[in-house]
Amino acid sequence: RFTMAAMASPGRDVKLAEERIEGYRNFTNKIWNAARFLLMHLDGERAEVPAAQRSFPDRWILSRLTATIGTVTQELEQYRFDRASSAIYQFIWHEYCDKYIEMIKPTLKDQASEQAKSTRQTLAETFETMMRLLHPFMPFISEEIWQTLPHEGASIVRKPYPTVRADWDSQEAEQEFSLLEECRGLMN
């Protein structure tokens, strides 16, 4: 389903390629691995901290998530399922898994710190929102993962679709991260 949505550009015939299906299978594996990582860290205490007071990586991922929600919502309203699925793919694979999870691993090693508690909250909050965002495209996988996580309600279907949250928007964190990426690029 996700593969078909990603390939469904208006006015274009879909040429189903086995390589594309394999690529999105790998994406599904990435989601499962992110869920396993989350489950390893959910047993610790979490802290309810306002988004503006969270760490740099936490503010950055929440800002990227709310921007992705805005993009996906806009693309779905225009029936651009290809662009909506691409935005979800880019966020989950490249921002959440490749960058955010790698940035927070050192923080999560000290389980008792206030920083770790806040980061666990952001990790869980972001993943839960990602599953609701992904659900129309991958309903079976998102539901299966949802059932393994602590949650309220019987099903992910009963949860509201994510909306843009102004309190998560942090242009400052995004600019800092862009600068960090530029510096990293210069060093390589």
What does each of the following model-derived ranges do?
Residues L16-R20, A87-I88, T119, Q147-T148:
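Composition- and surface-driven signal marking solvent-exposed, interaction-prone regions
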